[in-house]
């Protein structure tokens, strides 16, 4: 028995409509404040259905409906999975992160729920669509005319519904502007197209803004050595050194704080994704003016061009996002971050033969989720019970928080080991800066992970820990307690620490000059 092409399109539009359940849940929430929620709700629900139907008439012509229909199902179903389970918004920056994700990180999201989701919401519907015997009208002209009529009628129905209730529909969407970011499959497809265009566009010539940079000679008895620890997905809200009380996540660095050799600060991130925050914090641009289309030298380039020895080691799967492209860099991709202790020891040994001002960047894998339980060795499993799966919905809030806190504690241990290496090194005046790229949501208000647009991101995603340690007591005294910092300070602090002068250096943003 054959089914008409138009009936299949109606059924497909209805299924895509159902996959928009996150969108409709947000609509229902917004309708609580509407004067006539029933009429407005019907208008929106019916309007979305007919818009989807008109889209299918355009992009799913006869003979291609099984291919394009399957594509729309895949996009909508997987988008709905991450939106529903992690509270993700699939904007351009998130899609850039997707394009840069390696197999190891992608597999960290694999769990039983995703397998079931794929089976019942992707494979089964696509299998039914492919198995259908669809009745097509003969003749290209006839098929085109019927398809065109279907498009016009469905879009017309949507338009009429909106126009008849425009006095309610238009204000509703103005007051709930984020709804457009939940609509499937349009928003993720639009975001992916923008991300792909950004990745495929030829890189702009590098702006050599460090050309005017100069550096006064270091008259101190010892050269400066700065270890810059670039964190991953650590949020300030989970640092006991910043007032967090559930678990003592800073047990290892506490002695240095007590001895006034180290201090912690709550800082604002530049973004909620590594692909944004890392290039931004090393850039001369502040967060409000940051533009990733501008290809300019960064703080690392300034230091290298003025004679500072620069080394970059990482264990983060995402790499350095272009920041270390023009200096010596090595990424390990190991299971745990303790490989960076060995890297630091070896580099310190190498620098013994050429004692001059130097910076060593250590980029940790840190607290990257959702597989938090894989970020620390078993001996660091101090806080229990834990959530030993990437399906966070299976775990209690207490289990998720304990597991995440173990990752923070492990990073704290690593930092204490880095400091220990600096403490026993007599060749350099050693200092250390630690700052995370962005924070993390652990289920607060139903939101997990990170990556929400900055304007609506919760504090858990935008507030990150900043820590400074130094063997130089005078330097420690110059960094003021109780002062607000952000990643905007990093570029200027790095230049100021090594005495680099440039028109791009702003003394007011240098943490040691405020």
Task: List each language-model region with its residue ranges.
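Histidine-centered active-site microenvironments of extracellular/periplasmic hydrolases
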Residues: 243-248, 423, 428-472, 505-507
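Active-site-proximal alpha/beta segments of enzymes that process anionic O-linked groups
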Residues: 161-228, 233-388, 463, 487, ...
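A long, amphipathic alpha-helix that forms part
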Residues: 183, 348-349, 387-432, 468
């Amino acid at each position: 028995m054959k089914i008409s092409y138009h009936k299949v399109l109606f059924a497909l539009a209805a299924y895509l409509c159902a996959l928009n359940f996150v969108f409709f849940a947000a609509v229902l929430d917004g309708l609580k404040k509407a004067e006539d929620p029933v009429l407005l709700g019907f208008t929106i629900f019916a309007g979305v259905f007919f818009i989807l139907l008109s889209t299918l008439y355009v992009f799913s012509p006869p003979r291609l409906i099984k291919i394009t229909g399957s594509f729309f199902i895949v996009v909508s179903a997987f988008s709905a999975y991450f939106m529903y389970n992690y509270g993700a918004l699939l904007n351009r920056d998130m899609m850039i992160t997707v394009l840069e994700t390696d197999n190891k990180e992608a597999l960290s999201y694999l769990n039983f729920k995703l397998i079931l989701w794929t089976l019942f919401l992707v494979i089964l519907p696509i299998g039914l669509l492919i198995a259908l015997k669809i009745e097509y009208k003969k003749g290209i002209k006839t098929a085109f005319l019927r398809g065109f009529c279907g498009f016009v009628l469905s879009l017309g129905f949507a338009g009429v519904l909106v126009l008849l209730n425009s006095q309610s529909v238009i204000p509703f969407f103005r007051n709930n502007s984020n709804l457009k970011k939940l609509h499937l499959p349009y928003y993720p497809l639009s975001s992916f197209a923008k991300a792909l265009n950004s990745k495929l566009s030829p890189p702009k010539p590098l702006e050599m803004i460090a050309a005017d940079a100069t550096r006064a000679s270091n008259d101190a008895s010892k050269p400066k050595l700065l270890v810059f620890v670039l964190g991953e997905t650590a949020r300030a809200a989970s640092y006991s050194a910043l007032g967090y009380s559930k678990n003592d996540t800073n047990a290892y660095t506490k002695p240095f704080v007590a001895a006034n050799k180290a201090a912690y600060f709550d800082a604002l991130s530049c973004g909620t994704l590594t692909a944004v925050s890392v290039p931004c914090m090393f850039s001369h641009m502040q967060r409000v003016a940051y533009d990733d289309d501008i290809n300019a030298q960064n703080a690392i380039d300034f230091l290298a061009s003025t004679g500072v020895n620069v080394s970059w080691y990482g264990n983060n799967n995402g790499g350095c996002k272009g920041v270390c492209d023009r200096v010596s860099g090595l990424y390990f991709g190991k299971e745990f971050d303790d490989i960076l202790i060995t890297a630091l020891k070896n580099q310190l040994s190498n620098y013994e033969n050429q004692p001059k001002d130097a910076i060593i960047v250590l980029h940790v894998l840190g607290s990257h989720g959702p597989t938090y339980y894989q970020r620390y060795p078993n001996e660091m499993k101090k806080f229990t019970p834990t959530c030993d799966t990437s399906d966070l919905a299976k775990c209690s809030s207490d289990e998720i928080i304990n597991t995440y806190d173990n990752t923070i504690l492990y990073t704290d241990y690593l930092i204490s080991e880095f400091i220990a290496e600096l403490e026993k090194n007599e060749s350099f005046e050693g200092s250390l800066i630690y700052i995370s790229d962005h924070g993390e949501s652990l289920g607060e208000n139903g939101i997990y992970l990170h990556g929400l647009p900055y304007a609506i991101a919760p504090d858990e995603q935008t507030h990150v820990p900043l820590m400074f340690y130094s063997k130089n007591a005078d330097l420690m005294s110059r960094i003021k307690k109780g002062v607000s910092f952000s990643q905007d300070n990093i570029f200027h602090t790095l230049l100021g620490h090594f005495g680099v002068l440039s028109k791009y250096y702003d003394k007011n943003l240098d943490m040691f000059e405020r």
